[in-house]
Amino acid sequence: MKKVVCINDRKQPEGGELVEGKEYEVEKEFINNYEQKTFVIVGINNYGMTKLGMRWYGYDAKRFADLDALATETYEHAYAYN
């Protein structure tokens, strides 16, 4: 499974349980009805209803950074100094 870290936990819909800086595992990845890349996260609530009464399922992928990509950038940066 893909590992990601939350980089934006502001303005979550009602029932959202993301915490900025915490690592999560992605159970499922898909494109929703609004053509947004969406992640279903293991171990937290992934559905609910917004203040306007619209149902939501999964979290927008823009709220996360891929841990594998972050590790590669750090390694390349350290290599440049040596």
Task: Identify what each model region corresponds to.
Residues 1-10, 73-81:
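SH3-family beta-barrel domains
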